[in-house]
Regions:
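Conserved SDR Rossmann-fold cofactor-binding beta-strand/turn motif
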Residues: 52-62, 102, 115-117
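Catalytic loop of short-chain dehydrogenase/reductase
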Residues: 6-34, 39-48, 60-61
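A glycine/serine/threonine-rich, flexible loop-to-helix segment
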Residues: 48, 58-83, 123-125
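A conserved structural motif in NAD(P)-dependent oxidoreductases
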Residues: 83-94, 105
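Short C-terminal tail/terminal secondary-structure segment
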Residues: 99, 110-125
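Active-site pre-Tyr helix/loop in NAD(P)-dependent dehydrogenases
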Residues: 15-19, 85, 119
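Short, small/polar-rich loop/turn modules that mediate ligand/substrate recognition or access, typified
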Residues: 47, 52, 109-111
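Short-chain dehydrogenase/reductase
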Residues: 1, 39-40, 95-98, 102
Length: 125
């Protein structure tokens, strides 16, 4: 990959709907699951060139695309109630995780999906 610098770090965003059914998320869940698989395969393929590939699975955040998800406000409420830290994640928090993954501090991390969701993803029903 000639257009990437040596020691490059590639990063993408995904969502919990890739692993569990989220009502109304539908085909996006399938797309995000494929994206996460691509992260793992790219990490293996690019590792020989000392390039890292990771994903951040952020909790629900109020974005333009979130407006297309039916009852998005109720999803935010459920996360706030059930997540161990009892709050929704902010764009700043996700940015902080991204900064870590793009920095040399994470030089041994590749092929991973890092959950930045205040612990919501560890909770059962």
């Amino acid at each position: 990959m000639d257009m990437l610098n040596e020691n490059a770090s590639l990063l993408t965003l995904t969502y919990h709907g890739s692993r569990q059914v989220i009502e109304g998320y539908n085909v996006m869940g399938v797309a995000k699951a494929a994206l996460e698989a691509s992260v793992r395969y790219l990490a293996e393929n690019l590792g020989k060139d000392d390039m890292r590939v990771n994903a951040i699975s952020a909790g629900p955040i109020k974005t333009l695309s979130a407006k297309g998800i039916k009852d998005f406000g109720s999803i935010l409420t459920v996360v706030e109630e059930k997540a161990p830290l009892h709050q929704n994640v902010t764009t700043t928090q996700v940015g902080d995780v991204a900064s870590f993954l793009l920095s040399n501090m994470s030089s041994c991390v590749t092929g991973q999906t890092i959950y930045a969701d205040n612990g919501f993803s560890i909770m059962g029903i």
